[in-house]
């Protein structure tokens, strides 16, 4: 069995900056945009790019993520001899060990990768919102005769210190890499998307773990080693929509941008669809007291209140007299009567009782956590 390029999705992160939203679930399984979860964008990019084989590396609170992905059928990634495989830490003859970094997670799954005998390994993050053609990136990698290609995104100078920054020459060859520099020399931020020539990467990893120089992380260890040894490493500039939703603020902003019909993400593009695995639910129901403006309300919702510039995910209940404004309400949340929710994110399965208030500010978003209960709500 062989495949030209195998995908490996790093989906084991806790997402600590998302606080209460990831207390019981991994960051890639956090709901987004009404009917999606964050990892849907990476899985859909694989399917749309024609990359039909991928491993999904999980670790932190994987139950919800595993249940969501299942066998990959919702993304068309369930072909015989290909498809999606969930990869979790395991016990071997050398003992049981959790993944200690991004590169270590790949090293621990060499047997899985080798079973497909790939020429190229595509490393992906499972927690970004974007659309990208990985085949176009592979074509670039081949044209450059690269050993490593890193997808990069121009960012504002003040934002650059939050990312790994690539400094390149006039041929786009990477000449220097800085991990979250205090004074960045460039604004080309690593997107955490890499294409490696697998035989070369495998050699680097196995040799490092055979000595005391174990490579645990791509940013801290692998990329610097490639540059030190003059491996042909190139930056692939991506200029589409890309959002790192690793903070409450950025997650809220991305959801609000999702409501803009002119959003460059263009979720309605039938030539590059975003797929998901969703429960079959009845259509939304709006009572006579419901008022909706500039919002997205999906299947299973019951609305008796006012919804203004907000997203209601599947199976959300909004009581009479309640006002939801500039907010994102995650699946199965129940909001009682005469409740005010403004500039907020309400987590999955949360309950806000009658007359409650959850009010934030544009730069200080209020959060109700996963399954959190605030007050009591009368049953409709």
UniProtKB/Swiss-Prot annotation:
The keyword Transferase applies. Its EC number is 2.7.7.27. One of its GO terms (biological process) is glycogen biosynthetic process. Alpha-D-glucose 1-phosphate binds at residues 164, 179-180, 190. It holds the Pfam family NTP_transferase. Belongs to the bacterial/plant glucose-1-phosphate adenylyltransferase family. This is Glucose-1-phosphate adenylyltransferase. The gene is glgC.
């Amino acid at each position: 069995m062989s495949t030209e390029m195998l995908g490996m999705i790093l989906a084991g992160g806790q997402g600590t900056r998302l606080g209460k939203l990831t207390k019981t679930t991994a960051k890639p399984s956090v709901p987004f945009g009404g009917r999606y979860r964050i990892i849907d964008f990476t899985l859909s990019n694989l399917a749309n790019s024609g990359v039909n084989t991928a491993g999904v590396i999980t670790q932190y609170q994987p139950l919800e993520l595993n249940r969501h992905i299942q066998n990959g059928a919702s993304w068309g990634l369930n072909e015989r001899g290909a498809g999606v495989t969930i990869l979790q830490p395991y016990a071997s003859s050398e003992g049981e060990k959790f993944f200690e970094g991004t590169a270590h997670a790949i090293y621990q799954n060499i047997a899985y990768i080798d079973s497909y005998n790939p020429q190229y390994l595509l490393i992906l993050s499972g927690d970004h919102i974007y659309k990208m053609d990985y085949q176009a990136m592979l074509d670039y990698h081949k044209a450059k005769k690269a050993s490593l290609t890193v997808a990069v995104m121009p960012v504002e100078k003040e934002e650059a210190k939050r990312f790994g920054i690539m400094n390149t020459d006039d041929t786009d060859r990477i000449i220097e890499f800085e991990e979250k520099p205090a004074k960045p020399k460039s604004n080309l931020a690593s997107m955490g998307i890499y294409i490696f020539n697998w035989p070369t990467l495998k050699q680097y990893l196995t040799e490092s773990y055979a000595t005391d120089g174990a490579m645990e992380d791509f940013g801290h260890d692998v990329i610097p080693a490639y540059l030190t040894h003059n491996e042909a490493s190139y930056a692939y500039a991506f200029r589409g929509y890309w959002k790192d939703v690793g903070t409450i603020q950025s997650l809220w902003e991305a959801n609000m941008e999702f409501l803009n019909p002119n959003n460059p993400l263009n979720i309605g593009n039938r030539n590059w669809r975003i797929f998901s695995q969703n429960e079959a639910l009845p259509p939304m129901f709006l009572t006579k007291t419901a008022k909706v403006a500039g919002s997205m309300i999906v299947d299973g919702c019951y609305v008796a209140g006012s919804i203004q510039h907000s997203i209601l995910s599947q199976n959300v209940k909004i009581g009479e007299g309640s006002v939801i404004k500039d907010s994102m309400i995650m699946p199965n949340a129940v909001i009682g009567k005469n409740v005010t929710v403004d500039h907020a994110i309400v987590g999955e399965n949360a309950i806000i009782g009658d007359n409650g208030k959850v009010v934030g500010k544009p730069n200080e978003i209020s959060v109700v956590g996963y399954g959190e209960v605030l007050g009591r709500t009368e049953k409709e």
